UniProtKB/Swiss-Prot annotation:
One of its GO terms (biological process) is protein catabolic process. PANTHER family: LEUCYL/PHENYLALANYL-TRNA--PROTEIN TRANSFERASE, LEUCYL_PHENYLALANYL-TRNA--PROTEIN TRANSFERASE. It is an enzyme of class 2 (transferase). This is Leucyl/phenylalanyl-tRNA--protein transferase. GO terms for molecular function: leucyl-tRNA--protein transferase activity. It catalyses: N-terminal L-lysyl-[protein] + L-leucyl-tRNA(Leu) = N-terminal L-leucyl-L-lysyl-[protein] + tRNA(Leu) + H(+); N-terminal L-arginyl-[protein] + L-leucyl-tRNA(Leu) = N-terminal L-leucyl-L-arginyl-[protein] + tRNA(Leu) + H(+); L-phenylalanyl-tRNA(Phe) + an N-terminal L-alpha-aminoacyl-[protein] = an N-terminal L-phenylalanyl-L-alpha-aminoacyl-[protein] + tRNA(Phe). One of its GO terms (cellular component) is cytoplasm. It is found in: Cytoplasm. It comes from Azotobacter vinelandii (strain DJ / ATCC BAA-1303). Functions in the N-end rule pathway of protein degradation where it conjugates Leu, Phe and, less efficiently, Met from aminoacyl-tRNAs to the N-termini of proteins containing an N-terminal arginine or lysine. The lineage of its organism: Bacteria, Pseudomonadati, Pseudomonadota, Gammaproteobacteria, Pseudomonadales.
């Protein structure tokens, strides 16, 4: 049975109550306050819904993740990285990255990154929890991604690319940096060919929950300004 969240409570139902069809739908309602979003990620769920729908909260089983040590850099991507045709930065323009991620896609109608969603994640960025990766080419933003860093876990949200390999360069650079900072897992939420080509794989939700339990409150050496 689907749980309806109340605005005066930040609690979420146990993950095992999530529906099998559609896979992982856990709850509906609530709001996108910073406090609720932080609680959601710590609990193991995330918001995803289309404009005009109520807020839907998901915790799919299995969960797609990438372990930094398992990053797969193909020969062609390695060549692009060596050529240094792109420049990568962190937290230089979060607003521009999330705006670009909300842009139209050839394979989808509409966007789930609504103005309300953008405002919510920008608040998390102001609090030092949400971070962006920017990929530049000749001074123009051509790719990037954003997500949340909590403890030793990074929760990826969305990425975009306006040039061949731009998002892959940004993601690979982020993963290398996260591994250096002591992060143990990147939450990719749902499988895509793009992420799987970079080394992402699916694990049981119970295993994902174990990582939440053991690593959310451990420190990292992250320095997003460096």
């Amino acid at each position: 049975m689907l749980t309806c969240l109340q605005r005066d409570s930040l609690s979420f139902p146990p993950l095992e109550r999530a529906l099998h069809q559609p896979n992982g739908l856990l709850a509906v309602g609530g709001d996108l306050s910073a406090e609720r979003l932080i609680q959601a990620y710590r609990h193991g769920c995330f918001p995803w819904y289309q404009a005009g729908q109520p807020i839907l909260w998901w915790s799919p089983d299995p969960r797609t993740v990438l372990f930094p040590r398992e990053l797969h850099v193909s020969r062609s991507l390695r060549k692009v990285l060596r050529q240094e045709r792109f420049q990568v930065s962190f937290d230089r323009d979060f607003a521009a990255v999330i705006q670009a991620c909300a842009g139209p896609r050839d394979y989808a109608d509409g966007t789930w990154i609504t103005p309300e969603m953008r405002k919510a994640y920008q608040e998390l960025h102001h609090r030092g929890i949400a971070h962006s990766v920017e990929v530049w080419q000749n001074g123009v933003l051509v790719g990037g991604l954003y997500g949340l860093a909590i403890g030793q876990l990074f929760f990826g949200e969305s990425m975009f690319s306006h040039a061949d390999n731009a998002s892959k360069v940004g993601f690979a650079t982020l993963v290398e940096r996260l591994e250096r900072w002591g992060f143990v897992l990147i939450d990719c939420q749902m499988p895509t060919q793009h992420l799987q080509s970079l080394g992402a794989r699916s694990i049981p939700r119970t295993e994902f929950s174990d990582y939440l339990m053991h690593h959310l409150d451990l420190p990292s050496t992250a320095d997003w300004i460096a």
